[in-house]
C-alpha cells in the first residue's frame, strides 16, 4: 500500500478516520468460525421464472439483498447457483500493558476475507492493515458500528520496548560488571526492605530461559515463582512492581478469577449467534508474565485449569465443537496467604496453603516470607520506612478539567521510545546507584533476546551434585520428622528448575555459556527456597528466628526450666551442628554435654 497510513490502536479510532487506510496494533482476544459469504448472489423469481445475478465482490460485507425486483416481483435466493468466499471476524483489543490504569481496554471488530482467514488466533499480537468502515446498527439506528476490513495481517514476534544503540552500550557496560544480578536486584522495588533473594528470583523470572525440544517433548523455559507467607510482607507490592518493569505483563486476582477467565472460553457471538473462542489472561500474556494475587482464594477447579498452562504452556479447548490449542508461553508470579492467617512453621506448605503437591511442584521457586521480629530488624525496617516518608516525591492529583491520572501517566511513559536514563535521580538511597525502571525493562528485553547459552561441564557437575544433595536433604528430613516433611517436595522438576535459573543468570551476565557461577546462583536460590539455608549449610536469619521464637515461647511464656536438644531439633527441623551455630547468638544458656537449653537469670 502506498500513501499515508494512520498507525493507531483501538483506543484511537474516531469518526475522523473512517473510510481511510489504517494500521491497527493490538492483541486478538476473540475469533469466530469461518463462514461462507456471498460473492455472486443468484435470485429466482417464481412468477416469471427469471433469474437475477448480482455481483457482491466489491460491496460492503454486511449489505442486504433485495427481496423484490424493481417492478415489485418477489425474489428468492438460489444457494446452489450463487458463489461464496470465506468470511471470519476477529476482535482486536489494545495491548493490556498500554491501556490507561482504571479504564477498560478498547477493541475493534476485524473482518477477514478469503486468504486472510485463520491468519491469526486468540493471543496473537498483530498489526492489521485495512480500511475502517461504519456499519449501520439494528432498527435503522443513527449510531453506527465501526469495523476494520483487513487487507494484510502481520504477527509481531518481538516484545518489549525498542532499544537504541546508546541503550545497548549502557546494558553491555552493566553486563561487564563483576556481579550484575546484585546491582540489578537492588533496584527492584527499592522501597521494600530486604527480600534480596526474592528480588533476584524475580529478575531471573523476567529474563527466563529458552524452551527446548528433548526427545520430541517440549521443555518449558519460563520460570514460575510463588510468594507465600504472613500478611503485610510486601507480596502484593512486589507483584505491582513487576507489572511496571516487565516488557509484557497481565495482572489478575484469584478472588475473582475463574478457570476459563485465565485460560480460554467458548462464548456466543451476539451478532451471529455463532460460537466464538475468547482468550483468557494466560493466553493474552503469551511470552510475558502473569501476576496472580490472592492465589489462595481461587477454587480448586480453577487452579486445576492452570496445570496444563504451567508445564505444557498451551491451552487445549474441547468445547461446543471447537477443538484447538492456544499458546500460553508465560511465567506465573503468584502471591498467596496461609489458610489460617499466619504461616505455621510446624506445618508443611501443603498444609498451610491447602494446595496439592501436583501444583506446588510446577513452581520453580516457592518463597516462604515470614514476618520476622527482632529488635535489630524492627529498628532497621522502621528507619527505612521513615526515610522513605522524608524523601518521597509528592504527586498532586488535580480534579476538574485538568484532572491528571498519575498511574495513567506512568503507563503512557512506557510507550515512549528513546534513550533510557540509567540511574534514578533520588536522594533516598545515598551512596547507592539505582537503575531506573525504564532501563531495567530494556535490560530484560535485551537479555531475553540473546542467543541460548550452552551448558559447560563444570556447571553440569555443580547442578548434578546440588540435585543429589536436595534429594538427600529431603529424605533425611522425612525420616527425622516421621515422614511429615516441613519443606517443599523435591521432584525431578527441580533439576529442570536448576537449569532454567542458571541459564537466566547467564543471560543477565551476557555470557554465551552457562558457567559454574551461574549454577551456584541457581543452587543458592533453590536451597534457600526449600530449606532456608544455602547449599554450603550456612545459617540464614529465618532459621535462627525459628529457634529463638520456639525457645522464647517454651522458656518464658510456658515457664519451662529446660528444653532438650532433641525437642528443638524435631520442632525446628534442623540438625545438631546447625543448632550449635545458632545458640551462641541467642540470649539463652545451654549445656552441650547434657544437651539442653535453659533461661539465664
Swiss-Prot record:
Database matches in InterPro entries: AAA+_ATPase (IPR003593), MCM (IPR031327), Mcm3 (IPR008046), MCM_CS (IPR018525), MCM_dom (IPR001208), MCM_lid (IPR041562), MCM_OB (IPR033762), NA-bd_OB-fold (IPR012340)
Catalytic reaction list: ATP + H2O = ADP + phosphate + H(+)
Annotated MCM domain residues: 180-386
A single GO BP: double-strand break repair via break-induced replication
Positions with a binding annotation for ATP: 229-236
PROSITE patterns: MCM_1, MCM_2
Keywords: ATP-binding, Cell cycle, Chromosome, DNA replication, DNA-binding, Helicase, Hydrolase, Nucleotide-binding, Nucleus
Subcellular location as annotated: Nucleus; Chromosome; Nucleus, Nucleoplasm
GO molecular function, one term: ATP binding
SMART domains: AAA (SM00382), MCM (SM00350)
Entries under Pfam families matching the protein: MCM, MCM_lid, MCM_OB
Renumbered ranges of motif Arginine finger: 361-364
Signal peptide start and end residues: none
EC number from the UniProt entry: 3.6.4.12
GO CC term, one of those recorded: nucleoplasm
Subunit structure: Component of the MCM2-7 complex.
Family: Belongs to the MCM family.
PANTHER family noted in UniProt: DNA REPLICATION LICENSING FACTOR MCM FAMILY MEMBER, DNA REPLICATION LICENSING FACTOR MCM3-RELATED
Role this protein plays: Acts as a component of the MCM2-7 complex (MCM complex) which is the replicative helicase essential for DNA replication initiation and elongation in eukaryotic cells. Required for DNA replication and cell proliferation. The active ATPase sites in the MCM2-7 ring are formed through the interaction surfaces of two neighboring subunits such that a critical structure of a conserved arginine finger motif is provided in trans relative to the ATP-binding site of the Walker A box of the adjacent subunit.
Protein name (database record): DNA replication licensing factor MCM3
Organism field: Entamoeba histolytica (strain ATCC 30459 / HM-1:IMSS / ABRM)
Taxonomic lineage of the native organism: Eukaryota, Amoebozoa, Evosea, Archamoebae, Mastigamoebida
Amino acid at each position: 500500500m502506498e500513501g499515508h497510513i494512520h498507525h493507531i490502536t483501538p483506543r484511537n479510532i474516531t469518526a475522523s478516520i473512517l473510510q481511510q487506510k489504517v494500521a491497527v496494533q493490538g492483541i486478538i482476544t476473540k475469533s469466530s468460525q469461518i463462514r461462507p459469504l456471498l460473492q455472486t448472489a443468484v435470485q429466482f423469481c417464481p412468477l416469471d421464472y427469471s433469474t437475477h445475478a448480482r455481483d457482491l465482490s466489491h460491496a460492503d460485507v454486511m449489505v442486504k439483498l433485495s427481496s423484490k425486483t424493481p417492478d415489485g416481483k418477489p425474489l428468492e435466493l438460489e444457494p446452489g447457483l450463487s458463489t461464496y468466499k470465506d468470511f471470519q471476524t476477529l476482535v482486536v483489543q489494545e495491548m493490556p500493558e498500554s491501556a490507561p490504569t482504571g479504564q477498560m481496554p478498547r477493541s475493534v471488530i476485524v473482518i477477514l476475507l478469503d486468504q486472510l482467514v485463520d491468519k491469526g488466533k486468540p493471543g496473537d499480537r498483530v498489526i492489521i492493515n485495512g480500511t475502517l468502515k461504519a456499519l449501520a446498527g439494528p432498527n435503522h439506528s443513527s449510531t453506527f458500528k465501526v469495523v476494520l476490513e483487513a487487507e494484510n495481517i502481520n504477527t509481531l514476534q518481538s516484545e518489549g520496548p525498542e532499544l537504541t544503540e546508546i541503550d545497548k552500550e549502557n546494558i553491555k557496560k552493566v553486563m561487564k560488571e563483576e556481579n550484575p544480578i546484585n546491582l540489578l536486584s537492588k533496584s527492584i522495588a527499592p522501597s521494600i526492605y530486604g527480600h534480596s533473594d526474592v528480588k533476584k528470583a524475580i529478575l531471573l523470572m523476567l529474563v527466563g530461559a529458552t524452551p527446548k525440544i528433548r526427545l520430541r517433548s517440549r521443555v518449558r523455559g519460563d520460570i514460575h515463582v510463588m510468594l507465600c507467607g504472613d500478611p503485610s510482607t510486601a507480596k502484593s507490592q512486589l507483584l505491582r512492581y513487576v507489572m511496571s518493569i516487565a516488557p509484557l505483563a497481565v495482572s489478575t486476582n484469584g478472588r475473582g478469577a475463574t478457570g476459563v477467565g485465565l485460560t480460554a472460553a467458548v462464548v456466543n457471538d451476539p451478532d451471529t449467534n455463532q460460537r466464538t473462542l475468547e482468550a483468557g489472561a494466560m493466553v493474552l500474556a503469551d511470552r510475558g508474565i502473569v501476576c496472580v494475587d490472592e492465589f489462595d482464594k481461587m477454587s480448586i477447579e480453577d487452579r486445576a485449569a492452570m496445570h496444563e498452562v504451567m508445564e505444557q504452556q498451551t491451552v487445549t479447548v474441547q468445547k461446543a465443537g471447537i477443538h484447538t490449542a492456544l499458546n500460553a508461553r508465560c511465567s506465573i508470579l503468584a502471591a498467596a496467604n496461609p489458610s489460617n492467617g499466619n504461616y505455621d512453621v510446624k506445618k508443611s506448605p501443603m498444609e498451610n496453603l491447602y494446595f496439592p503437591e501436583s501444583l506446588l511442584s510446577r513452581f520453580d521457586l516457592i518463597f516462604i516470607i515470614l514476618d520476622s521480629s527482632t529488635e535489630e530488624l524492627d529498628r532497621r525496617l522502621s528507619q527505612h520506612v521513615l526515610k522513605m516518608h522524608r524523601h518521597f516525591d509528592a504527586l498532586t492529583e488535580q480534579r476538574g478539567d485538568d484532572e491528571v491520572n498519575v498511574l495513567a501517566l506512568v503507563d503512557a511513559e512506557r510507550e515512549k521510545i528513546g534513550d533510557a536514563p540509567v540511574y534514578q535521580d533520588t536522594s533516598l538511597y545515598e551512596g547507592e546507584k539505582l537503575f531506573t525502571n525504564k532501563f531495567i525493562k530494556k535490560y530484560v528485553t535485551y537479555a531475553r533476546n540473546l542467543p541460548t547459552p550452552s551448558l559447560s561441564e563444570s556447571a553440569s557437575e555443580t547442578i548434578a551434585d546440588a540435585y543429589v544433595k536436595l534429594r538427600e536433604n529431603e529424605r533425611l528430613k522425612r525420616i527425622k520428622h516421621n515422614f511429615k516433611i516441613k519443606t517443599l517436595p523435591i521432584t525431578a522438576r527441580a533439576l529442570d528448575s536448576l537449569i532454567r535459573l542458571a541459564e537466566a543468570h547467564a543471560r543477565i551476565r551476557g555470557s554465551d555459556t552457562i558457567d559454574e557461577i551461574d549454577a551456584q546462583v541457581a543452587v543458592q536460590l533453590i536451597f534457600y527456597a526449600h530449606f532456608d539455608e544455602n547449599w554450603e549449610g550456612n545459617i540464614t536469619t529465618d532459621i535462627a528466628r525459628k529457634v529463638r521464637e520456639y525457645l522464647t515461647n517454651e522458656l518464658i511464656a510456658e515457664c519451662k526450666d529446660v528444653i532438650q536438644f532433641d525437642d528443638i531439633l524435631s520442632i525446628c527441623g534442623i540438625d545438631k551442628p546447625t543448632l550449635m551455630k545458632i545458640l551462641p547468638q541467642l540470649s539463652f544458656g545451654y549445656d552441650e554435654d547434657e544437651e539442653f537449653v535453659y533461661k539465664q537469670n
